[in-house]
C-alpha cells in the first residue's frame, strides 16, 4: 500500500499508509476502522511494528477531546489484533495547541459513545 499525506493540526503533513482494516462488533453492531503505519516505521528510534489507530466517536467534544483520540497498536503475529478502548488517549494538541497532531480521518468515525479511555480535562 502506498503512503499518503495525513493532515495535522499544523502545516505539517505525516506520511501514513493504511496497514489494515480492523473489523469488530460492539453491542451487536459491526464496525470497521483503518489502522495506519507511518513511513518512519523502522527508522532509528521508531518501532517497525508500531501501528496508529486514530478514531472519532460520539463522546468527542462532550466528555472527550473534540478532535478524537488515539490508540497505539503493534503488528500482530497472526491476523487478529485486540482493540482495547481503555487504552484510548488524547493527542498532545488536546493539552497545547502548539503540538502538531494528525487529524483523525473521517472514515474512522464510530457512531456511538465510547466511554472507555482518557476523558477531557479541565483547566484549573
Regions found by a protein language model. Give the residues of each.
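Mid-length scaffold segments of soluble, non-membrane domains
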Residues: 3-66
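A structural detector for beta-sheet-dominated domains
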Residues: 25-27, 34-36, 56, 74-76, ...
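Acidic, glycine-rich flexible loop segments
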Residues: 52-89
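Extended, aromatic/histidine-rich regions of cofactor-dependent oxidoreductases associated
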Residues: 88-124
Amino acid at each position: 500500500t502506498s503512503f499518503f499525506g495525513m493532515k495535522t493540526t499544523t502545516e505539517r503533513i505525516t506520511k501514513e499508509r493504511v496497514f489494515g482494516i480492523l473489523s469488530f462488533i460492539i453491542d451487536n453492531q459491526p464496525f470497521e476502522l483503518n489502522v495506519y503505519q507511518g513511513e518512519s516505521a523502522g527508522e532509528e528510534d521508531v518501532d517497525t511494528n508500531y501501528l496508529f489507530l486514530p478514531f472519532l466517536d460520539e463522546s468527542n467534544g462532550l466528555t472527550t477531546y473534540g478532535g478524537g483520540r488515539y490508540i497505539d497498536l503493534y503488528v500482530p503475529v497472526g491476523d487478529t489484533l485486540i482493540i482495547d478502548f481503555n487504552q484510548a488517549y488524547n493527542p498532545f494538541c488536546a493539552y497545547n495547541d502548539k503540538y502538531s497532531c494528525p487529524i483523525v480521518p473521517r472514515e474512522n468515525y464510530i457512531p456511538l459513545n465510547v466511554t472507555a479511555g482518557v476523558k477531557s480535562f479541565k483547566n484549573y
